[in-house]
Amino acid sequence: MNISNIKKIELEITSNCNAACPGCARTQNLDILKVESFTINDLKRMFPVKEHIDGKMFKFCGVLGDPIINEDCLEMIKYLTSNNGYCQFSTNGGLRSREWWIELGKLSKDTGLVDVSFCVDGHKETNHIYRVNTVFDNIARNMEAYAYGGEGRQQATWIYIVFDHNEYELDAARAHAERLGFKFATRTGMRNSMHDWISQTKKKENGKLVKETSVITTTGTKEHSKKALVQDLDAFIKTYKPQMMTTNNIPIVVVDKKAEVLNSIKCKLIHEGEIFIASNQTMWPCCFLWDSQFKNKENIIEKMAEYGGDWNSLKHHTIDEILAHPWFDKILGESWDPIHSKHLSRCIRTCAYNKAYQNEINVE
């Protein structure tokens, strides 16, 4: 595989963020967070020629940060679109000036290559409960500016995670999106169906700032439709032991549920031609394994230690060189087997049963 086979690149251009969403890996791990960003020059080094960009999708998102906090964000979008790269990015929409957003809206209108997902989980009364530290009035101003710049021809979607506390504002948000000329979508995340979150916000009361704590829950029809499948995969991960039989005194592993599970994996890299570039400029098959690296889940750092410190760093290697590395080229797929020395159960949990764990987005 080489860059010509890659169709989609997810870019985490910064690990910085203006928000403090309680379910975010960044908020939960501030003690180990390193605020890192890459520049327009870094992006040009990674994608130096049109052939590496033309016709590909560049998703500005990531695990740890919001792309618009990166000072070079707009220049990156201009560079990629000038080389016929399609830019889709997710943001809480709470930063930048009105003029910045007007320019981005105009770029979307003029090129047809910019699509913004405004991740706004509520309306005036509730968005800040999960999107902690964001200000709805600023977000509304920025969405309005983007629509103004796009003159009705911009591409944008208001994506709304439906929790128990914000469900009642769905109609207000839906109507607001329609006025702006945006699509409207609801999103369900597996982690929200598996966990409750504690939100710490502040509000003014009698002229003083008062702390307010909210428990964020997702119940009933708002839960992910494949929750039971992921629970089944979790049970497999926890209990799997290879069944053995002996033939001529030679132990043989019996084909059991493992085959069903492994054959159902749909890998972002291997099956969909996608790569993920983290804010520290390391390259991964997906955001999930970068998240594992960030937290050192399943001792992933120790499992990769034999490759050296810069084996997947785009500061030291090209995309093609990293794709040719034995781990990307062969070991990744082999390691889905639970008995493999470099096995990461994250691959099963997030991508087995054909990506049961991953977000469900319903565009209306």
Question: PLM features: residue spans?
Answer:
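N-terminal pre-triad scaffold of radical SAM enzymes
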Residues: 1-23, 55-62, 268, 272-281
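Membrane-proximal basic amphipathic "stem/tether" segments
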Residues: 1-5, 345, 349-364
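Local cysteine-cluster metal-coordination motifs and their immediate loop/turn environment
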Residues: 18-26, 342-355
